[in-house]
Amino acid sequence: MSGFVLAIDQGTTSTRAILFDGQMKVAGSGQKEFAQHYPASGWVEHDPEEIWASVVTTVKAALKNAGKAASDVAAIGITNQRETVVVWDRATGKPIHNAIVWQDRRTAPLCQKLKKQGLEKKFTRKTGLLLDPYFSGTKIAWILDKVKGGRKRAEKGELLAGTIDSFLIWRLTGGKVHATDATNASRTLVYNIAENAWDDELLAILNIPAKLLPQVKDCADDYGVTERDLFGAEIRILGVAGDQHAATIGQACFEPGMMKSTYGTGCFALLNTGSDLVRSKNRLLTTIAYRLNGKTTYALEGSIFIAGAAVQWLRDGIKVIGKAEQSGKLADEADPTQNVYLVPAFVGLGAPHWDAEARGAIFGLTRNSGPAEFARAALEAVAYQTRDLLDAMRKDWKGTSAKTVLRVDGGMVASDWTMQRLADILDAPVDRPTILETTALGAAWLAGSKAGVWPKAKEFAKSWALERRFKPEMDIATRSAKLAGWRDAVRRTLSA
């Protein structure tokens, strides 16, 4: 059997398809961006049809670029932007509304209402999550409430709902399979992570009929086969994981205590806690890292909504840079005597604050502040927010030592300046791997190992290779002063 495995990486701003060969090297790829829709303040939507078209286009491009046919591919692994939801017609496969994206804040009033009813502890105890618009459950409820006839059709069994992976699986299999994996399910706010099942009580609170939801499977499992006429041959779908979980796998963080952080649009740090379902006392999330062979591995997660998006804001919003790649060079030119802080709460603050009403702010500006100081503040904000997460993780999990090593991936980690500043602020080594396509690699490994053409976990972990380790160089006094300034800036940004 061929060792070629195709990863579909459906992200927030673009879709990528990457074909890996039997040595787990990239053989071909395709990428296509798609539109972001902002129908109201705090609202973010995607057109599911555009996402679907981007998947078909990029898969064909990856195969063409590699000079391979669909019949050469042993399996497909899917990884996706999490929490983003689609509700579609069971008969036609047509969405009844645009996908509501993970960044969307429209359900903040519903979350506040549920909090006032004293329900947050119940949701947290069962799902490991907090009552925040970030998660899928309230988004599904909103669509059913706001789309004409939505609730009635849902009760009659005419509709299906799911995260992006479920919608893609449904389309790829020609409507034969409605499924998701445990990691995506764990982000919905209605999945009991201790019992590994949809929670009837939480579904009732949000008035979501269980019949809408997909079957939950292991991350490496049988998700059906693609329709022959899509790519010219049937391809088995054997792996599915949310993007951050796939990155955890791609970084070979299989042992308790191992930690990875992905720096893309947002920043997401996951700490493997093994079979230990840790209840955070510091406003972190408890989530499923992955589920393999029926065994669940848990993680603590810190979610930061704005990381690379702050650099996009520098480029597209205030236009102080022409290209995102210029940010590190510009930051290096900043006046070291200026203490400018950017708190990038453009859509609220994530962990560990979880303040949906907070908004972005800049502190410490002087007449001499310019593009360089803005660039440095944007990049340093990523490091400061990661430090907040690491501190919370160290408080929450007894197995976390002060000798943490952070494995990093995502678009921002190509910047040496950003990675060095991250190591300085964390006071911990930061490891950048040789393969930066860790999210796609993780999805491919799930499918390839299930197909029997790629190695099992232990051998796969041995293949992880370090490109560069960034060691802390900042002195204690400077670090302490910078962190104190950051915490003061955050305090002044919080809504209450």
Swiss-Prot record:
Which keywords describe this protein according to UniProt? ATP-binding, Glycerol metabolism, Kinase, Nucleotide-binding, Transferase
PANTHER family attached here? GLYCEROL KINASE, SUGAR KINASE
What family is reported?
Belongs to the FGGY kinase family.
Enzyme class, broadest EC rank = transferase
EC no. given is: 2.7.1.30
InterPro entries for the chain = ATPase_NBD, Carb_kinase_FGGY, Carb_kinase_FGGY_CS, FGGY_C, FGGY_N, Glycerol_kin
Q: What's a Pfam family in this record?
A: FGGY_C
Q: Which reaction does it catalyse?
A: glycerol + ATP = sn-glycerol 3-phosphate + ADP + H(+)
Q: Record's Gene Ontology CC terms?
A: cytosol
What lineage does UniProt assign to this protein's organism?
Bacteria, Pseudomonadati, Pseudomonadota, Alphaproteobacteria, Hyphomicrobiales
Protein residues bound to ATP = T12, T13, S14, T265, G308, Q312, G411
Query: Does the record carry Transferase as a key word?
Result: yes
Q: Which residues bind ADP?
A: T12, R16, T265, G308, G411
Residues at which glycerol binds: R82, E83, Y134, D243, Q244
Q: What does this protein do?
A: Key enzyme in the regulation of glycerol uptake and metabolism. Catalyzes the phosphorylation of glycerol to yield sn-glycerol 3-phosphate.
Q: What is this protein called?
A: Glycerol kinase
